[in-house]
């Protein structure tokens, strides 16, 4: 529909703005009476909350990944201790004072209220005055309703007991928290209605110029996500509903989609053309690119001189940083860990020819290979062979699949101090990774990848899990294999497939491992562990079981409680 071709221009304006803090209110200075003068004013208002939503991903990502078993932020020499905040996430010992817990709550409710303000305004405007058809106007409102449901889904998964706010008119909102079931029902109703009001994707290509808009398949996939986790979130299984809706998406009932041909196509610089993307936040070097400029992509690699290895020295976002590393598969003395959970490098190595296991390299012309960074990282500078050095500058960096104090140790040497925990690590500890490409300065695709929130593979894996839980293991395996085939060479893929198409047995543990491989570092690991009943009971590197299951949800921060006397703290805190 022609009016939504204008969205690209609208996003260009909003994406340049940037979020300044979690407490911003975008309508403080401009009233609705004098703001909405043109059709483009309406479109800009609708998509302003999307820019905040993109920014807010960082808080969710930290809570989901650093409380799980696959990545961690251990102390690296004198770096990344930060008052113990990352250790508390790892050990599940967070408190009501932790800002990380507060940020997700405030970030989501800021976005919710932005959506509410816009929806209130849209309900008072005359669409004909702005030359919108009824269908077009309903689509606009459904954009904000779907985004609001996305925020509420995050809150339901993280805190379970939250207020329900649907308007700037406080009389229409709950005073305190509502029951999880009430919030679940609200999200479900909103999304089911929006699936009918939103446009379906046009054609069989990617989202193209309308990347960043919700469409029918995106809203339906949010429902799949909601139903998949219902048993934990409201105590009632919704796997049947999840499977039915996932199958509809795969059947093309909400638009035409297909898996990317390679594992990394969906993350590449031109992923607006990828048919696997259901919903993504647009990103561009000249506009907003939060996931590059901090905390996600930029901080999964060694610091400082890694830019020479990557060739992205002019990307304009300062030094790379080493916040995230793969949890180790080995002790400092080389003894392999044997825990069921964690050990991500070992889990990838189970299938030795996995393309993602290759050393990450930029190949030029907007191409890359591999996902992992390990061992010595060699590069050439002015015709001379060089290596990435430690950020402290005192030795060549050798990344190993272990955490400890390896300063002065060669690749095969064992340190005198064999302690391995969150407070005993260094810059050589742990493999690093590059999931979204960090292209070199000469590549036009540098920092251009859109952030993919929902992709077709998630729908396939969700359906596979539903079938597995029904006891239809072969059907589940076949579904997973449709995605997994692209991870291995064509002449070797048969030996890596799940039975009955290959020799690998699909068990519940393997299913959880496969979720971890396919969606590694995509901001969902905590939720997956909870669904498999492993988050509190599981054991992984430097992590023993929690004393009970109250840590499956986070507490309300002290500031949040003090701001509203009607709120009650979650049990166990």
What are these regions (language model features)?
Residues 102, 363, 367-483:
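C-terminal substrate/ligand-recognition segments
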Residues 154-163, 202, 226-235, 471:
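Short coil/turn linking the two alpha-helices of tandem helical-hairpin repeats
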Residues 38-56, 79-159, 174-185, 191-206, ...:
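Conserved, well-structured interaction surfaces
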Residues 18-21, 39, 50, 79-81, ...:
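Long, intrinsically disordered, low-complexity segments
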Residues 1-17:
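Sec-dependent bacterial lipoprotein signal peptides
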